[in-house]
């Protein structure tokens, strides 16, 4: 007898199952094939987009400008990296040890000083999460195991009682011009998430998986014949694909080696009383408690075939030094340190597992910070320059791309803009030359995917 635990009934399972098989196809669950199968356009690689919401400072991260006047240069000083002649902000001590493994772009600008959520969702993507383009072209799930191809993870995906999406300035899980079925899969929004994904089935029938799939295929053919699939939505389909693929363990960090979890964990780096005077104190807590584990989750999902993963903790990089936000020095201690630790742990783990040619990590925010330090020892909004870190597949190791002006406020070389970054992500995921030959690609998707060149100097 097939049944879901808790909220899903047997009828719900059958609805999910039949819709899932209709949209994905049982043959695709076994193996994608056929010359026209869009799955052939997928590189099999993963883009992990770590969004630094609030707007990180270029000075205190990767462009400290220590020869500039005191009103401009990094307030946290600088730290030497293992790349001769390259310095990072003083809080980036762990990443400084790995600077020979990634690229820093010092000429990237979003062009906006507003709290939106570009570049992950922006006018340049027609208001869609970048990963929704992968889903629209390839499909929503990996046909081999049911893993969602586009996932957006927030603190509540890894730490109970921490918040979910912070959508005040835009929806991270927006599909823009595409239907809601192409929105990112968001773990942690439905309560007992791990249990919700487990299909409870007696051992005898579980062992007879082939018979089970044959039965579901029969159901699929029946509903195709009478049209009863009408009215069932894509979310049910996606849920079915997840449980049938057995991918719930990928979202369960308790399955991970305890030493690995401890290596990623950022919860011990800060204390609540250090920011309790700020209105954004709960955001700081969520960031500290979850960032490392979110990066571990991203690695687990990448290993299991997820194509695009959005990671963001909360609104923590807006370091104005006011009633709501920390200033630059305290902010980099309590926000920059977890970032430094989590990204360095991720790089070490990926390198140890030999995954560096399979994963692209992008870390940036919606804007940078002003060259001049304000009267409260913070920095304000600035769209002229934004820090950008790139690591992994297709990325030169130990490189700096572009240069900033003397005051660190604008590019001194050709600007890298959001369409170039989007193109870099999608070029990593898709076979663009083959995609151009297809006649079934929506015009909106083609405009975004082919509308700009990837970042110059990569590859």
Model segments located where?
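Ligand-binding pockets and gating/stacking loops
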Residues: 1-459
């Amino acid at each position: 007898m097939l049944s879901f635990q808790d909220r899903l009934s047997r009828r719900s399972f059958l609805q999910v199952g039949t819709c899932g098989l209709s949209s994905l196809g049982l043959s695709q669950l076994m193996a994608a094939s056929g010359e026209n199968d869009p799955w052939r356009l997928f590189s099999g690689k993963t883009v992990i987009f770590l969004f630094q919401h609030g707007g990180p400072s270029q000075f205190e991260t990767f462009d400290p400008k220590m020869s500039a006047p005191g009103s401009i240069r990094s307030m946290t000083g600088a730290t030497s990296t293992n790349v001769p002649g390259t310095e990072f902000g003083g809080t980036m001590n762990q990443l400084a040890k790995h600077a020979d493994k990634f690229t820093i772009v010092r000429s990237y600008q979003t062009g906006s000083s507003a709290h939106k959520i570009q570049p992950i969702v922006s006018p340049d993507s027609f208001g869609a999460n970048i990963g929704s383009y992968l889903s629209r072209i390839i499909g929503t799930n990996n046909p081999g195991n049911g893993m969602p191809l586009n996932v957006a993870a927030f603190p509540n995906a890894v730490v109970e009682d921490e918040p979910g999406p912070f959508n005040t300035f835009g929806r991270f899980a927006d599909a823009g011009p595409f239907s809601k079925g192409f929105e990112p899969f968001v773990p942690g929004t439905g309560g007992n998430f791990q249990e919700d994904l487990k299909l409870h089935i007696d051992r005898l029938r579980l062992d007879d998986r082939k018979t089970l799939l044959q039965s579901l295929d029969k159901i699929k053919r029946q509903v195709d014949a009478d049209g009863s699939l009408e009215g069932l939505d894509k979310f049910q389909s996606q849920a079915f694909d997840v449980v049938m693929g057995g991918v719930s363990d990928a979202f369960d960090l308790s399955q991970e080696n305890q030493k690995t979890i401890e290596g990623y964990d950022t919860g011990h780096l800060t204390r609540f009383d250090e920011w309790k005077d700020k209105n954004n104190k709960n955001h700081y807590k969520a960031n500290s408690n979850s960032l490392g584990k979110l990066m571990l989750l991203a690695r687990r999902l990448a290993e299991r075939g997820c194509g695009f993963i959005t990671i963001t903790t909360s609104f923590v990089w807006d370091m104005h030094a006011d009633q709501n936000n920390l200033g630059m020095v305290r902010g980099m201690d309590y926000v920059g340190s977890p970032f430094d630790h989590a990204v360095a742990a991720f790089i070490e783990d990926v390198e140890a597992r030999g995954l560096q040619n399979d994963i692209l990590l992008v870390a940036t925010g919606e804007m940078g910070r002003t060259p001049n330090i304000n009267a409260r020892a913070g920095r304000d909004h600035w769209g002229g320059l934004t820090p950008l870190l790139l690591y992994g597949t297709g990325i030169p190791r130990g490189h700096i791309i572009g240069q900033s002006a003397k005051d660190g406020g604008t590019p001194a070389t050709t600007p890298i803009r959001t369409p170039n970054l989007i193109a870099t992500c999608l070029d990593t995921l898709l076979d663009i030359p083959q995609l151009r030959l297809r006649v079934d690609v929506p015009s909106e998707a083609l405009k975004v995917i082919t509308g700009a060149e990837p970042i110059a100097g990569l590859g």
